[in-house]
Amino acid sequence: MQYEDENGVNEPSRRRLLKGIGALALAGSCPVAHAQKTQSAPGTLSPDARNEKQPFYGEHQAGILTPQQAAMMLVAFDVLASDKADLERLFRLLTQRFAFLTQGGAAPETPNPRLPPLDSGILGGYIAPDNLTITLSVGHSLFDERFGLAPQMPKKLQKMTRFPNDSLDAALCHGDVLLQICANTQDTVIHALRDIIKHTPDLLSVRWKREGFISDHAARSKGKETPINLLGFKDGTANPDSQNAKLMQKVVWVTADQQEPAWTIGGSYQAVRLIQFRVEFWDRTPLKEQQTIFGRDKQTGAPLGMLHEHDVPDYASDPEGKVIALDSHIRLANPRTAESESSLMLRRGYSYSLGVTNSGQLDMGLLFVCYQHDLEKGFLTVQKRLNGEALEEYVKPIGGGYFFALPGVKDANDYLGSALLRV
């Protein structure tokens, strides 16, 4: 394991190596033009979740306010594009692939069996939308000297540095771009990733990948049921209402009054943290201690001393923390003061399970993702309040990064990142 230092790893040499590999892959791939001949879609398809779809065009990207789907993947890439024109080609191509994959259609037929197939085939002859969303974000490193974009970097975007409890693996950190791919089923998520990689061999190289999940019944509730994390507690109870457009404008979206570059309006700062849980240790911890650490009842999700999950804790009547400890997770994360109102963020986390670590412990945890209009006021402020909390004994952040989720695609003539690249 290579640990991340404050200055990061040597990126230019890595990119030069990957560009050579990508060029070889492109030389052996099939031209996209061969996809003109396609199979006909089946005449009937059972009216189930496979036909569910999210709008692709709009002011904002899907996958941020969208109710959480059951399956999720985070994939960070190094960009191999050599100049700004190449980067535009990449963003146009990604937009085309996202538009097709999220809306569904017939899988392309391979015109010559001696050539590689144009589709992986894992979804069969018809690619159902399956509630797929693909959200594109850009990292701090995309605004280096390669594309001349430095003056247009979002003002609060920065490289993720280590917090006191972090044990960051350099191989699991950062990225020029990040895809958050979500759908009702895992095979749709995997199909989307393979399609994107197949179409961009000379433009993208995978840097790191993690797959996550929430329970099917939580996903089917469309946000009405809070997912439970692998520590056994509800995760996201205190989220602001994503259906409240006025509130989301205040919490999630960058707006014109923030003195950000004009192209960022309608986008959102994204914080990603890969957090490993010490589940064996946690499972041997008394229930009372677990609940004290979180500040919530494990079964109901209610704040301690209250009855219902969404009851608002009354910290003013508990100044000494006799009911909800002063260092409990919920009290530190959101002390519910006038000052903490500005640090609200929209969480969209998923559990992960990867097997076992080198020490023989279960490799399980949380893919923490949150969106906010200001990274410093949102995630960074909250995380600083959480430094030293009792929960740190059971969790260990090992990777992730800070990104900016691009504004949406207006129509079929537009593409992701167009306002950025046209400056």
UniProtKB/Swiss-Prot annotation:
The keyword Aminoacyl-tRNA synthetase is annotated on this UniProt entry: no
Cofactor remark from the record: Binds 1 heme b (iron(II)-protoporphyrin IX) group non-covalently per subunit.
Biological process according to GO: iron import into cell
PROSITE patterns cross-referenced by the UniProt entry: DYP_PEROXIDASE, TAT
Cofactor: heme b
Signal sequence interval, chain numbering: 1-35
Modification(s) after translation: Predicted to be exported by the Tat system. The position of the signal peptide cleavage has not been experimentally proven.
Location in or out of the cell: Periplasm
Binding site for heme b: G236, T237, A238, H329, N334, P335, R336, R347
GO cellular component: cytosol; periplasmic space
InterPro entries per the UniProt record, alphabetical: Dimeric_a/b-barrel, Dyp_perox_C, Dyp_perox_N, Dyp_peroxidase, EfeB/EfeN, TAT_signal
GO molecular function, one term: peroxidase activity
Keyword Iron: yes
Catalytic reactions on record: heme b + 2 H(+) = protoporphyrin IX + Fe(2+)
Record-linked Pfam families: Dyp_perox_C (PF20628), Dyp_perox_N (PF04261)
Keywords: Heme, Iron, Lyase, Metal-binding, Oxidoreductase, Periplasm, Peroxidase, Signal
Enzyme Commission identifier(s): 4.98.1.1, 1.11.1.-
Similarity annotation: Belongs to the DyP-type peroxidase family. EfeB subfamily.
Subunit structure: Homodimer. Part of a ferrous iron transporter composed of EfeU, EfeO and EfeB.
Cross-referenced PANTHER family: DEFERROCHELATASE (PTHR30521:SF4), DEFERROCHELATASE/PEROXIDASE (PTHR30521)
Role, per record: Involved in the recovery of exogenous heme iron. Extracts iron from heme while preserving the protoporphyrin ring intact.
Protein name per the record: Deferrochelatase
Organism, scientific name: Escherichia coli O6:K15:H31 (strain 536 / UPEC)
Gene name per UniProt: efeB
